[in-house]
Amino acid sequence: CDVGMLLSADMDYQDRSEIIFNEIKRAHSAYKLNNGIIKIYHIGRNKKRIFDANVYFWNGIIWENIKIHTDFKKSMKLFSDGSGKKEYDENFLRFKNGNNESTRNYFHCFCDIVKNVKDKHTGGIPQLVGLYNGSKFNGMYHGTIVDGQAYYQGLKMGNIYGMSNIRWYNENFEICDWNTKQREANAMVQPISKRATP
């Protein structure tokens, strides 16, 4: 997005991370009121096409560039944060069965907590971004269908022409048809994870 001014296509993730981190520190130093906590998450791929992640963390005094562990052999949560973190983490402990540690299980839990969260600063419509391995892909926004209504990046979508080229998912993490708002006929059924009794 910087049109080659700071980053180049041949840079490794670590080089990009250091440049971005230093630019954030430089820009932040111009603010007079900067004693609050700030966290900025950065996820990308290295030259081996493996995901890397960092959090750029301002603790009110100094900046830190902290690496997030990403070397997993199966779907895992990289982090949870924000005012809804505690409820999400507690809620996820109750989501278990054959779907445990699957991508859809994390999404089921996320949709459930967004709908039923007690924290007044958390809520709204789930927003979904896909990060894919392979040289042809970068981050891609996906649409979500909640209670028969389509949303894209959290915004309600009417019957807008051209939205069929976006991949749509319902709360079950099933691929849906943009026109019908229903699960596509050939899409895999993704049953909701059963909650364990407390």
Regions found by a protein language model. Name each.
Residues 1-198:
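N-terminal nucleophile
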